[in-house]
Amino acid sequence: MPRHETDCRYFANGYCSKGNTCTFTHDVATRNENICHFNLVGKCSYGRACRFLHTRPRNDELPSCSTPQTSQNQQNLQNSGQRVRPKQLPELKFNAQAAEFVPRWKMPQRGPVTSYAGAAASADHGESSSSFQSSHEQAQLMMCPYHQKSGDCNRQDMDCPFAHGNYCDMCQQWSLHPYNAELRKKHENECVANHTTEMERAFLLQKTEQKTCGICMENIFEKNLRFGILNGCQHCFCLDCIRQWRSKDQENVELATKTVRSCPECRQHSDYVIPSLFWVESGQEKDLLIEMYKENTKRKICKYYSNERSRGACPFGNKCFYKHQLPDGSIDPGEAPSSRRRPRLVDFLFDDNSDSDEETFRRFQEEHEEEQEELLRFVAETLPEADEESELFRQITEVLRHYQISGHRRGFQ
């Protein structure tokens, strides 16, 4: 293999990994006997496996220093014939006799230490006011954050530029300003307000833990459910059960809306259900909950206005709690909600808007005169015992009212 005229620097240093296949010149005359420098000081970790020579060089083959020396120094070293030994460095060990480390801020003060506030005060008011502040300046001092939490400050009282407050029994912190009565009174009022809020929350939680749903009979708090509070009564239900109960008028046509909109226990009508994490029974707490519920729903867009197909078809009209926002950002005022009415029996018997003549009505009255007399006799016997909430009472009342109106209109009353 052709070789370059350049000498192999790896072979010259003692070892070439390519051996005879190296393309550079391996000249023995240029090879330097690499002596292990670690062995010279007696600390070679490889031992016999080291690839460098573990021999001591002759006087004329001493290793050169890393820094270049002048020719005069080399000549003096060769002429002296002295053997140069490497300098032995001291071994690193833990000193058990060393002094204990003390942070600077814990060291005893050798002289007066002037804080930033003290330096500013001395610059403004002179040397006489550096150690004393007026009552107005003391009242404007900020509270020390370290002393406020634990009552302990790393600095001494005379060196800390902040005010060290007094202990507050309500919040159990050193938060009472020692010089400013206004700030001290303000903090006391805040603590009293927070304490009152925590007490009210504890009372609500105590009442909440004992409530069970009137439909599924489960403990609502233990099941991690929400309460469905009716605005018209004080009975307790979980939100899922009462919503399922109130949606039956859309699933089963046999149940009237008035029935499912009433409480399952007391039949008291309620217009809406309020979801809540705590049980609120009555009084100002319930009024506040209703106001918060309405304010919260005002920020949400009504589902009938979020869909393009049903936009503007909200059955609640301007009575809806949600926001009727149009795509352009404007608010639709809406109209009053229209009342929904189920089909009645009288609607199929008579039609007030029909254009039937008097002859048709007279013939119908003659044909059904006997049925009318029997119906009136039946009503006279049954009406005192009929329940005003029953469906029969409602239908009979509608028929009689229609007979009376039709007869008065045509002169047959």
Curated annotation (Swiss-Prot):
GO terms for biological process: nematode larval development; neuron maturation; protein polyubiquitination; protein ubiquitination; sex differentiation; ubiquitin-dependent protein catabolic process. The keyword Transport does not apply. Signal peptide: none annotated. A zinc finger (RING-type) spans 213-267. Keywords: Cytoplasm, Differentiation, Metal-binding, Repeat, RNA-binding, Sexual differentiation, Transferase, Ubl conjugation pathway, Zinc, Zinc-finger. It is found in: Cytoplasm. This is E3 ubiquitin-protein ligase makorin. Residues 61-85 are annotated as: Disordered. It comes from the Eukaryota. SMART domains: RING, ZnF_C3H1. CDD domains: RING-HC_MKRN. E3 ubiquitin ligase which catalyzes the covalent attachment of ubiquitin moieties onto substrate proteins. Promotes the larval to adult transition by binding to the long non-coding RNA lep-5 to target the heterochronic protein lin-28 for degradation by the proteasome. This association and degradation of lin-28 also controls the timing of the sexual differentiation of individual neurons in males including the AIM, AWA, ADF, ASJ and CEM neurons. Plays a role in governing the developmental timing of male tail tip morphogenesis. Component of a complex at least containing lep-2, lin-28 and the long non-coding RNA lep-5, which mediates the degradation of lin-28. It is an enzyme of class 2 (transferase). It catalyses: S-ubiquitinyl-[E2 ubiquitin-conjugating enzyme]-L-cysteine + [acceptor protein]-L-lysine = [E2 ubiquitin-conjugating enzyme]-L-cysteine + N(6)-ubiquitinyl-[acceptor protein]-L-lysine. PANTHER family: IP09428P-RELATED, MAKORIN-RELATED. One of its GO terms (cellular component) is cytoplasm. Its EC number is 2.3.2.27. Residues 66-82 have a biased composition (Low complexity). A zinc finger (C3H1-type) spans 2-29, 30-57, 138-167, 296-327. Expressed in seam, tail tip, and other hypodermal cells, head and tail neurons, the pharynx, intestine and the developing hermaphrodite somatic gonad. Not expressed in body wall muscle cells. InterPro entries: MKRN-like, Znf_CCCH, Znf_CCCH_sf, Znf_RING, Znf_RING/FYVE/PHD, Znf_RING_CS. GO terms for molecular function: RNA binding; ubiquitin protein ligase activity; zinc ion binding. The keyword Membrane does not apply. Pathway: Protein modification; protein ubiquitination.
